[in-house]
Amino acid sequence: EELVELVEAYTKAVGLFRTPEAEEKVQYSEYLELDLSTVEPSLAGPKRPQDRVPLKEVKKSFLAHLTKPVKERGFGLSEDQLQRKVLVKRRDEEFELTHGSVVIAAITSCTNTSNPSVMLGAGLLAKKAVEAGLDRKPWVKTSLAPGSKVVTDYLEMSGLMPFLEALGFHLVGYGCTTCIGNSGPLPEPVHDAITAGKLVA
């Protein structure tokens, strides 16, 4: 109760306290309207986080960047280099890596891990995948690093954590990891194949 009173006093002091009556008196300097039907999923990259690519155009954009000059944020590959494939042997398995092979999948401590509906959605998706007999590819390094212990608490209480773990999304810690380059090393055979084959992966 003391904390509630403190929060109320603070929000009133800084002008953030809202009641239905007060809301009627609020005047905004600007109104923004957004047609939600125009919002579409997107990815960042392939080189800079500020380069937004609509999800439906990712394949086309990635292929175009492979041959673009490096000074134009491309990878400068020749047409011959585009077909490059590398055979990898890891633990009793053999597989091929090519340009664009996804080798890291991480659920990390960005804004999304503070959103229970998104995280529970990830857990439900993992549950469906496991129940359907699906698994990650053997060359993909996976990890789970939410920004708060609350996330693992509700994933465990909901019974969804075992399904994420079954797909390799084990808890590696709380806080920034893969997104800032703290993914740790790739499995040696995968790293060596990408390096030797000069793959964009």
Language model regions located:
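Fe-S-dependent hydro-lyases/dehydratases of central metabolism
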Residues: 1-201
